Structures are given as C-alpha cells and as structure tokens.
Amino acid sequence: MADAAGIATVLAADGRDFLLRNSADQVKISSIEASTVALYFSASWCPPCRRFTPKLIEAYNELVSQGKNFEVVFVSGDKDQEAFDAYFAKMPWLAVPFSDSECRAKLNKRFKVRGIPHLVILNATSGEVYTEDGVELVTVHGTEAYPFTTERINELKEQEKAAKDNQTVQSVLGTPTRDYLLSNKGDRVPISDLEGKYVGLCFVVNGYGPVVQFTSLLAKFYEKLKEVGEKFEVVAVSLDSDEELSNESFAGMPWLAIPQEDKMGEKLARYFELRGLPTLVLIGPDGKTLNNNVADIIDEHGQDAWEGFPFTAEKMEILAEKAKAKAELQTLESLLVIGDLDFVLGKDGAKVPVSELVGKTVLLYFSAKWCGPCRAFLPKLVDEYNKIKEKHNDFEIIFISSDRDQSSYDEFFSGMPWLALPLGDERKQHLSKTFRVRGIPSLVAIGADGRTVARDAKTPLTAHGADAFPFTEERLLEMERKIDEMAKGWPGKLKHELHDEHELVLTRCTTYGCDGCDEMGSSWSYRCRECDFDLHPKCALGKEEEKKGDDEAEAEADPACEGGVCRKA
C-alpha cells in the first residue's frame, strides 16, 4: 500500500483522496499497491505525446503482466473535459481528475514541467524522484529500465558501455532471438554475412525530404562501391512508428533492413547519439564504429564521395583537394546556368541573363511563403537589401522558392525587390545540394569572382545588417572586432524585468534566439545559463546604452588630439 507520507502527499488535494480510471471509477490513493509510480504529463493535442503514449501503454501492460509493482498516473494538459475523456479512454492506468485543475497546476509547478510528454518516476513510499527522464528511458529501454532507480539506470549505462567496448555487427543489428536482416524482397539474410565488411546504418523516416534526397544519393554511392569491389553493405534503420510506412520506404531501397517489428530504431538512435537526419553510421570490418555520421561527407562530395571511402584521414585529404580544385573553378554561371536555363526572373517577369550578374555579390535566398520563419525574416532582408543597394550597385539577391504552388510563389515574390528562379526550376535542386541547404530561410553569399564567400550569410546579416556586406571572412572578422570593442562599454552583469529570477551575464557566444524580441542574435548575449535565457544587448540595455558602448569604442579607436596635433591613442 502507498504510504500516506509518500505518493498520497504528492497526488491528494483538499477534499479529494482518489484518482480515476477511464471507466470513471474512483480509486483511493491509499489503495495503490505499486512501489514505483510514474506521473505522465501529456495531452491529446501534442503529436509527440500521441507518439509516445502507445509505447508507454505497451511497457505498462508488459510490466503489469509480469507482476511488477508499477503504476502510472496521467496528469492532463488537455484544453477541455471532452479532449481529456477521449485521450484517457485509451489509457489502462489512473488519472488526476481533469476537474482538479489546481492539483494539475501544482504538479506541473512542483516537477518543473516545461514540455510534454514528460514522465516523472517516483518511489511510491517516500515520494523520492527516481528520474525525470522517464520518456527517454521507456523509449530506449522499454521494460528493461524498470524499476527506474538510479542503480538500474547506472546498470543500463554500464551494459551500454560494455556493449560498445565489445561491439560486433551481431550485437548492433541482432537480438537474442533474431540473427538475420531482411532484403527488400522479404528474404532473410544472416547477419553473419556482414562480418568482415564495412556496414553503413542509414536512419530513415518515410517521406522526410532530406532523407529521401540522401537515400537517392546513397543508392548511387552504394552501387559505385559495389562496382569497384568494395565490401560494403547498407542497413536501413527505420524511425517510423508505423510498420506500413516503414515497409513503403524500404521497398525502393537496394539494401537490407532491420525488421520493423523489432522496434530498434530509437534504441540505435540513442546508442549512436543521433543528432539529426540524414545520418549514416559507418561500422568497420571488425564491427567497431568508425564514424557516427558520414552522410554529410557523401552529401557534400556527391558523385566523387566514393573516392574517399572509407573516409580515413588520408582519403579525406584526397576529397578535400578535389573539392578545393572544384571550388577554385566555380563561377556564377557554373552555378546558375544549366543548358538553356541561363536566366533569372525580374519583377515584371522578364528574363534577366545570368551573364548580367557576373561581377556582382549575389545572395541566394532559399525561402517559401508557407514557412513562418521565412515570412518573419523577409521584412528584415528587404530593409537590409535596400540599404546595401543604396551604396553598392554591384549586389543582388535571387529568390529560390520551395513554395508548393504558383499562387503562393507569386504572392511571396511580389513582396521582394530582387530577382528569382522560376518555381520548380531544376537549378533549385542543384543549388540546394551544392550548398547542403537543410532548412529555410537560408542565405548563401557568392562573391564578385563567382566563388562562395559564405554558406551562411543569414547569421551575419541578422547580426550586423547591411554592414556585413560583402560577407567575406575579412569583413565579418572586422565586424566581430567592432562588436567586441563595443562590449567593453557594457555592464558585465545586470537584472532585467523580463527575467527577474537571476542576474543576466554578458556572454560571448555564437548564434542564439533572443527571448526579448524573438529574433536571432550572435556574438554577445546577456544570458542566464541556469534558465537558458538570452537577451540581445540592445534588448537588455536599450538602444542608448548600447550606443554608449559603441561611442566609447569609437573614442578609443579615434586619434587623440591635443595642441592641434592628432596622434594615435
């Protein structure tokens, strides 16, 4: 039975000493016999919650069937009783009544719930928190994580470390009950057939654009290595929760796959510390991991990537030299002219020859109307474009659209004072691949000589505005030095009304999102590390104080004048 000083203290409220089942039956908190209780903060409107709930149900049912003393209590974040009832109807555990909003708010505050799904696991007797990382533990380890104590979590970490130290293709790809993989025809292929070969683990999500593009490139890379006699295999690792979707994406791949029913995707994602997609983990002939992700290498070097395989330091030098030679030969026309496509569009729909842009600094602007951040960034870009054009006529921007229909393209382009590629132009795919555009909005700067000067021109333009022109490394370093001088005139710490819990510390940093104006910043931030809170110096200080720092920096840099003679200070 649950101790009154334990879980009851956490879950009870004035006038209520019970929880609910989805049948509406009341269950006395004091009657809970579980020794381990999980508080599940979730809501039906949250897609990640809807994806995680079936995993928690599966783990819960398995633990209950094994006779484990485990209970879950749903703490809803739904917006109304109807949504709560529909969502809770699928759950086999208990819940705090939706009507007890005070208790739900208290629990959210007590356990500092900043996002959902969130699973806090407690000792039912003492109320001690075992872990607040229940979602990750259930996702990765399932029932093996029970009873979720620190000791058990440490055991799992030790097992994982031992597995990595003694890693083989069988330990990575197999299970105690399965020693085979599947071909795209459904044939079973023994994992032992991969021993002594290089193996690439390709994490896939059906229909996800960057993965679809990469797997198309990987297929050519795979076939080329086969052609030259390399012992190389690819194994697809699906991250889809839907078996039908997983099978659909695998059907068009020429390699092997882990059976979807084993649900190993998220476990392997954590094992290999997956950071994003696309990802191709490279395992050597001895079964040990050589590289946690070679997808960027293949993506960057395209059809030449096979010459760098298996991407040792020596092989990478070969690829780097080839890439350098290719970059030296790059011109604006080599980027923007493919066959008869030797033009861009002007505002009146007129075709502007690419040759007329040669000798100018050109920003390639990857964007789309459907993209919220793109719409938010556009006014800033238009403003800075006009400022640059006032001083530099040798400058232009080309809009490269990811819009899905002509009307959206036309409407979005109508608000831009620059040029564009036609919607659906084949050069878009070529340019996106060349510059590895992973998201939008994105700005790539091409110098007057036709060579790339900045793959990310958005960050310096956001930070420095028109002063970032012409986006060369020398110019950006000059701007950084100027800002560093300005920062010498700013206070090292301050308190601000937007974050009065802690002091904000002036911190040198890369890029960040300002919690004051919601715009991006770089170089310097007033930051609270404890709360992951950032403010632009201009938001923290106000423009006058920031300018004061600017004035002080300029005063230090100006010559000192005395007696009619100016000398360097």
From Swiss-Prot:
EC number: 1.8.1.8
Region entry Disordered, spans: 544-569
Keywords, alphabetical: NAD, Oxidoreductase, Repeat
SUPFAM superfamilies the UniProt entry points to: Cysteine-rich domain (SSF57889), Thioredoxin-like (SSF52833)
Pfam families: C1_2 (PF03107), Thioredoxin_8 (PF13905)
Family, as annotated: Belongs to the nucleoredoxin family.
Protein name: Probable nucleoredoxin 1-1
UniProt source species: Oryza sativa subsp. japonica
